[in-house]
């Protein structure tokens, strides 16, 4: 068999130059047999007969091509063929994935040295020479290189990197189960994986006691702890911390709000302040404030403070929001499904309300009457999923606690977030409610005005106020009607109305603790004895709104505030109102009463005395003398008197007998 090779294929063979030009020069000088290669366009390509090459070069060329020349001809060198089932590639590369960075770097260091040694051996260089040459070039041990080379020979070349990974690290992490009796292992994990979260040291102490009792074979504490660390993390969290903590192992969803409009979606929640406040009724409490926040811009839109989270603070703060900013066409609200927030007065009629018994005839709640769509935060393992509401972040580190609870005006009243974090001046003072509410308003304003907010819409530059002002200008809203505003006010129980048109309202026990008298002249003529009153507890000395028991609006009533005994101006105002009432009443009488009493008398018909009726019974006349008639008349009178005495005596006897029987 004749073998023809190009000058490039001959380059770098033993005894030949390293370049094609050098090979051509040697070939011309030594007179190698050559020919022009066919099929080459645009020039001539020369190739040489392999028999013209020096013996060393020819042997290396044949070895490179997998052949060898003998006296009996050319033989193809047999190489081991690797079948797919010889080894598990996935398991091999899994070892690579589980290796440490240092193990992978070490494998990558040995890979080029092993590849170089393999190429030199394929070119016919002796094993000793090849390993020594490569080891000297890469500055590694020749014997170690030889071990690495034979280590990868049973794998395909693309898998050599994974095959070179040192498995000693993995072996150190594997604990032989033969050291640990299965019963002992089950005892340990049953003790360790409990909601009480016992310390591992104490679990191991109990394991040692049980092992001595039952003759179990157990490893050292460090080995057992490594075995515990190999347990599935999700399983450990679920058993020791609960389902709620397990759900937190899933990364939080990243949501965008860019597609929303300002005021299109709001969310609310209550925040318990860490401040002692002397409330309006004299009690020292930690008040709770309900906040409404715009989801897109994160601005706090409205709030109301109370002794607890209740329907009053929620509906009044909602009234503040819609009164100031209006109601968008596509309106959404997200709140927790708590007893205070998800009550029927606010959310009744919502199809997805899972609080209290839902009835088909439930009246629509105020949120739905305002055109809002209700959304509830999730409940996981009996606990709320707070990360679903952006307003929760306003209560976190650097939030409203820093702006309000730790304000210098409230120094000495701060309680700390928990009993373990009480300040040294804990309980020094309790601030008045007026001061606290003023500080709360200032803190919310500072919270909204701080620039450089790291939110999607602020971009690390703007404040919540800046973004809301920009986005709100592009939002279409409708202002609530007066009737809608009155619907959001607090409804009082039915109160009695006096004939003067005044009534007493005992309201605001939780918000103000007030008792006021209200009046409107229209109530005198409303024809009702009781009215239902709607009011704002923070405006009790202003106007309240009166409704009939079936919900029809009657009028507004103003508060009759007490005045000083020597207040002449108030006296003049009272006399002016008396004159006004007198004049208005006279005008009403004049308009209503259009005839006087004389005119009424003239219109009455003349009534004549009726004639005596005629008797239709005729008696028999028996004449007698006058003397006899008088005598008989006297006898009759005596008889009548005596008969009456007997009758009265008989009645007395009967009454006495009746009483005896009754006794």
Swiss-Prot record:
UniProt region (Involved in flaps endonuclease activity), positions on chain: 575-579
DNA-binding region: 176-196
Residue ranges, annotated region (1-gamma, viral genome ends binding): 175-247
Keywords in alphabetical order: DNA excision, DNA integration, DNA recombination, DNA replication, DNA-binding, Early protein, Host cytoplasm, Hydrolase, Latency-replication decision, Ligase, Magnesium, Metal-binding, Nuclease, Transposable element, Transposition, Viral DNA replication
InterPro entries (UniProt xref): DNA-bd_dom_put_sf, Homeodomain-like_sf, Mu-type_HTH, Mu_I-gamma, Phage_Mu_transposase, RNaseH-like_sf, RNaseH_sf, Transposase-like_Mu_C
Outcome recorded upon mutating residue 596 to N: Almost no effect on both the DNA cleavage and joining activities without bloing tetramer assembly
Compartment(s) where it occurs, according to its Swiss-Prot or TrEMBL record: Host cytoplasm
GO BP annotations listed: DNA integration; DNA repair; DNA replication; DNA transposition; latency-replication decision; viral DNA genome replication
Residue span of region Interaction with MuB: 605-663
GO cellular component: host cell cytoplasm
Binding site for Mg(2+): 269, 336, 392
Sections of the chain in a coiled coil: none
Annotated spans, 1-beta, viral genome ends binding: 77-174
Induction remark: Expressed in the early phase of the viral replicative cycle. Expression of early genes is repressed by viral Repc (latency) and favored by viral Ner protein.
Cofactor(s), by name: Mg(2+)
Note: This enzyme is structurally similar to and performs the same endonucleotidic reaction as retroviral integrases, RNase H, RuvC holliday resolvases and RAG proteins.
Quaternary structure and interacting proteins, as annotated: Homotetramer. Part of the transpososome complex composed of a DDE-recombinase A tetramer synapsing the ends of the viral genome and the enhancer element. Interacts with target DNA activator B; this interaction brings DDE-recombinase A to the transposition target site. Interacts with host ClpX; this interaction remodels the transpososome for replication and is required for the flaps endonuclease activity of DDE-recombinase A.
Known role: Responsible for viral genome integration into the host chromosome. During integration of the incoming virus, DDE-recombinase A cleaves both viral DNA ends and the resulting 3'-OH perform a nucleophilic attack of the host DNA. The 5' flanking DNA attached to the ends of the viral genome (flaps) are resected by the DDE-recombinase A endonuclease activity, with the help of host chaperone ClpX. The gaps created in the host chromosome by the viral genome insertion are repaired by the host primary machinery for double-strand break repair.
Stated name of the protein: DDE-recombinase A
Gene name of this polypeptide: A
